[in-house]
Swiss-Prot record:
Name used for this protein in its record: Doublesex- and mab-3-related transcription factor C1
Residue segments, region Disordered: 26-48, 136-174
Tissue: Expressed in Sertoli cells in male testis.
Pfam family, one: DMRT-like
Gene name for this UniProt entry: Dmrtc1
Organism (species): Mus musculus (Mouse)
UniProt lineage: Eukaryota, Metazoa, Chordata, Craniata, Vertebrata
Length: 182
């Protein structure tokens, strides 16, 4: 019973919407012709109806209408009938059909990704320094000692094993001993 009432109401709304669209299309056509010769004209007549393709969305929503020959820019239709939404008859570009919005979650995701990448690079640099230090203890020392107050990478010394450095205190180093940092 309720479904029948909704169907009747939808059919009557659909028919009324179709008639309104046909009247508006005829008024727009007439206004376009008259405006080009005489300037702006107020429309209050109801010329004969014409066929207009239409696509209703669902019951309770606005009627979606595509007008043939309507430019993709602004139109006089929204000011005359604000309950209509105009759209082009066909869209062939698939990129226009997909949302192009980049929300805050995408921005946060990019920031987290960059931070993780930086952390991985830092860990790789520390691992390379540790590897270089371990290989230097097996070979002869570099021969160019750092200054007495310098913290960080300790050059190989036969009496003292190399001390690993933290990521915050990496020295710029001597070119003949360390070529990792740029």
């Amino acid at each position: 019973m309720v479904e029948e009432e909704v169907a009747k109401k939808y059919d009557s709304s659909f028919t009324a919407g179709k008639n309104t669209v046909q009247q508006i299309q005829a008024q727009v056509d007439t206004a376009t012709q008259e405006e080009s010769s005489q300037g702006p004209v107020l429309l209050n007549q109801h010329p004969e109806t014409t066929s207009v393709p239409y696509t209703p969305e669902t019951v309770g929503q606005q009627l979606m209408v595509s007008l043939p020959g309507e430019p993709h820019g602004t139109s006089a239709m929204p000011s005359m009938c604000p309950s209509l939404i105009l759209q082009p008859c066909a869209t062939t570009d698939p990129m226009l059909l997909q949302p192009q919005v980049m929300g805050p979650s995408a921005s946060n995701q990019a920031s987290v990704s960059a931070t993780l990448e930086w952390q991985e690079m830092l860990e790789a640099a520390e691992a390379l320094l540790a590897l270089k230090n371990s290989s230097q203890t097996r070979h002869q020392p570099c021969g160019m000692p750092g200054t007495a107050g310098e913290r960080g990478l300790q050059l190989a010394n036969p009496s003292m094993p190399p001390r690993p450095t933290s990521s915050g205190s990496l020295p710029s180093g001597h070119l003949d001993c360390m070529s990792l940092l740029t």
